């Protein structure tokens, strides 16, 4: 059967041997020609030629924490083709990634993960330059503070369904995991494409999951040998395995599509074309809004459930705050969150403990960079080591403990602290830094805070039961998927209503909302989505 479909002359064993040989020669050449200026930066002993190997080792966050404590502000490693400088202090972050951002805001070349899989159109993996800045401008226009505020009606509406789903569809103690994903996905789909997602088995949700899985695999360090050893990209095409293309295209026709972000981008496309953007890039911007806004928010919400189930005292403190600010007779609203500093602190604390990118945030030096007495050469991968930055005992007392109170003196949004010149004022680095700071950070914090306030108002979150006995909550690294994204593995948890009255309020509020709908930037939205 293989002989019938293989191309003429196709000899996989010879091509594999050729790939290995070219890879070895390329590594040896790179090793002999390596820039020795990095020798002034300390680092762990690793293997010749490949350093740690062609990809990061398992449980890299724990390893990177250990090395940061041993080597200080910066240390160096090698992963495949690239030298890495790992950055471990806010001061070093400010000096390297912010003050010298024009040199350090790029991404390492990714011949397969970026160029092939995304056609070179995906912003998170796009090199810094004119194309990236053009697309960043598109995103900036739809993530301004006023535009972010316009999301609130959809966030409150979806939160009501979330509470209803948690109350009525978690008998197996595991469905909540997908309800969090539906909540986050429906918010961003309604605003971007005008379509609501009523349940997690919605076709759009399943398509997004498949696309996200491809993008996670292809953007992870070491996902493809060709990305860590770029000379392999020069092999004959027959040597490259077929990659699944992941693209989210905005199929919008003027006058027919709902008045959503994808339509706005489509209708203003000529002005973006004039600046150099392409049709494919604008489609990826629309799809990228969904990519950035759904799995990260859902994963953080599920991490919150994990930590809250293990910390009943935190729930007690939050419940007391909710009763003072809201009372037991109505659901909390977004306006109430201004009077819920402890709830907002819970959100900051989970973002500190579980930054969505693991073990940190990667940049790439387009030019030589000077840090103290060190020269970091052009072509070096730069990693903001959140695995250590967020667990530095000098900055955080008992960093392994979930202690929201540590953030009660940080009442502002993360983006506000990121804009400050004093790096020590940063609450955390989860939303990146420098010119690649996440433009949707404020939107994400609102989605998290609205959902959390509602959940803690309505329910006590308890660990799952096995044979009638509560299970111990696993909060170790083993509780998380080893994907380069900090997403908890599915786990068991129960949502117990605080009272029959609150349970009825949850049910009544969703019944009313599902019949009445709401308005989003002046456009009616019903149970299916935007109606015009």
Swiss-Prot record:
Q: Copy the pathway line from the protein's UniProt record.
A: Pigment biosynthesis; Secondary metabolite biosynthesis
Q: What does the record give as EC number?
A: 1.-.-.-
Q: What induces it?
A: Expression is significantly up-regulated at the end of late growth phase, in the presence of Butyrolactone I. Expression is positively regulated by the pgm cluster-specific transcription factor pgmR.
**Family listed:** Belongs to the cytochrome P450 family.
GO MF terms, alphabetically ordered:
heme binding; iron ion binding; monooxygenase activity; oxidoreductase activity, acting on paired donors, with incorporation or reduction of molecular oxygen
Q: What is the protein name stated in its UniProt record?
A: Cytochrome P450 monooxygenase pgmC
According to the UniProt record, what class of enzyme is this? Answer: oxidoreductase
Q: Which cofactor does it need?
A: heme
Its topology with respect to the membrane? Single-pass membrane protein
- Name the InterPro entries on file: Cyt_P450 (IPR001128), Cyt_P450_CS (IPR017972), Cyt_P450_E_grp-I (IPR002401), Cyt_P450_sf (IPR036396), Cytochrome_P450_fung (IPR050364)
The cellular location(s) given in this protein's UniProt record come to: Membrane
What is the protein's major site of localization? membrane
Summarize the record's disruption phenotype note: Abolished completely the production of the naphthoquinones derived pigments and leads to the accumulation of fusarubinaldehyde, the methylated product of pmgB.
What is the documented function of this protein? Cytochrome P450 monooxygenase; part of the gene cluster that mediates the biosynthesis of pleosporalin A, ascomycone A, as well as a third cryptic naphthoquinone derived pigment, all responsible for the coloration of conidia. PgmC has low substrate-specificity and is also able to use the pgmA product 3-acetonyl-1,6,8-trihydroxy-2-naphthaldehyde as a substrate. The pathway begins with the biosynthesis of the cyclized heptaketide 3-acetonyl-1,6,8-trihydroxy-2-naphthaldehyde by the NR-PKS pgmA.
| Family matches, as Pfam families | p450
Bilayer-crossing residues are: 15-32
Q: Cite the binding residues for heme.
A: 438
Give the CC-aspect GO terms.
Answer: membrane
Please tell me whether the keyword Secreted is annotated for this protein.
no
The species is Aspergillus terreus (strain NIH 2624 / FGSC A1156)
Q: Which UniProt keywords apply?
A: Iron, Membrane, Metal-binding, Oxidoreductase, Transmembrane, Transmembrane helix
List the CDD domains hit by this protein, alphabetically: CYP64-like
């Amino acid at each position: 059967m293989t002989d019938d479909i293989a191309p003429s002359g196709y000899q996989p064993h010879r091509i594999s041997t050729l790939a290995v040989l070219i890879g070895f020669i390329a590594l040896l050449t790179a090793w002999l020609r390596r820039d020795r200026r990095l020798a002034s930066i300390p680092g762990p002993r690793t293997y010749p030629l490949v350093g740690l190997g062609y990809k990061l080792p398992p449980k890299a966050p724990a390893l990177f924490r250990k090395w940061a404590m041993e080597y200080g502000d910066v240390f160096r490693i090698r992963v495949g083709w690239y030298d890495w400088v790992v950055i471990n202090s806010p001061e070093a972050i400010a000096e390297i990634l912010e003050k010298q951002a024009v040199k350090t805001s790029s991404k390492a070349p990714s011949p397969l993960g970026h160029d092939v899989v995304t056609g070179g159109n995906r912003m998170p993996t796009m090199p810094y330059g004119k194309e990236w800045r053009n697309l960043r401008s598109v995103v900036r226009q739809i993530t301004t503070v006023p535009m972010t505020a316009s999301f609130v009606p959809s966030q409150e509406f979806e939160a009501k369904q979330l509470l209803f789903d948690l109350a009525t569809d978690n008998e197996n103690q595991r469905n909540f995991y997908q309800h969090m994903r539906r909540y986050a996905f429906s918010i961003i789909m309604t605003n971007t494409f005008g379509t609501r997602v009523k349940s997690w088995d919605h076709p759009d949700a399943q398509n997004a999951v498949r696309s996200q899985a491809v993008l996670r695999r292809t953007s992870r360090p070491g996902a493809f040998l060709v990305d860590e050893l770029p000379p392999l990209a020069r092999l004959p095409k027959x040597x490259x395995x077929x990659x699944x293309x992941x693209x989210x295209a905005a199929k919008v026709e003027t006058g027919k599509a709902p008045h959503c972000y994808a339509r706005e981008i489509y209708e203003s496309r000529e002005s973006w074309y004039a600046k150099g953007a392409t049709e494919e890039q604008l489609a990826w911007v629309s799809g990228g809004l969904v990519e950035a806004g759904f799995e990260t928010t859902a994963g953080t919400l599920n991490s919150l459930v994990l930590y809250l189930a293990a910390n009943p005292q935190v729930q007690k403190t939050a419940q007391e705050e909710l009763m003072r600010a809201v009372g037991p007779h109505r659901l909390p609203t977004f306006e109430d969150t201004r009077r819920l500093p402890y709830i907002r602190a819970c959100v900051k604390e989970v973002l500190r403990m579980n930054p969505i990118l693991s073990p940190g945030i990667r940049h790439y030096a387009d030019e030589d960079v000077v840090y103290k007495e060190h020269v970091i050469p052009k072509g070096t991968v730069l990693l903001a080591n959140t695995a250590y930055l967020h667990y530095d005992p000098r900055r955080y007392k008992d960093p392994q403990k979930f202690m929201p109170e540590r953030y009660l003196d940080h009442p502002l949004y993360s983006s506000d602290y990121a804009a400050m010149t004093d790096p020590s004022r940063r609450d955390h680095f989860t939303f990146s830094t420098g010119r690649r700071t996440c433009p949707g950070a404020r939107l994400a914090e609102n989605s998290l805070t609205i959902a959390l306030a509602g959940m803690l108002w309505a329910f006590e979150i308890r660990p799952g039961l096995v044979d009638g006995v509560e299970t111990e909550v696993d909060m170790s690294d083993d509780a998380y998927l080893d994907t380069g994204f900090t997403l908890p593995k599915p786990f068991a948890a129960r949502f117990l209503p605080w009272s029959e009255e609150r349970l009825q309020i949850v049910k009544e509020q969703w019944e009313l909302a599902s019949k009445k709908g709401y308005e989003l930037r002046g456009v009616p939205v019903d149970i299916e989505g935007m109606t015009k």
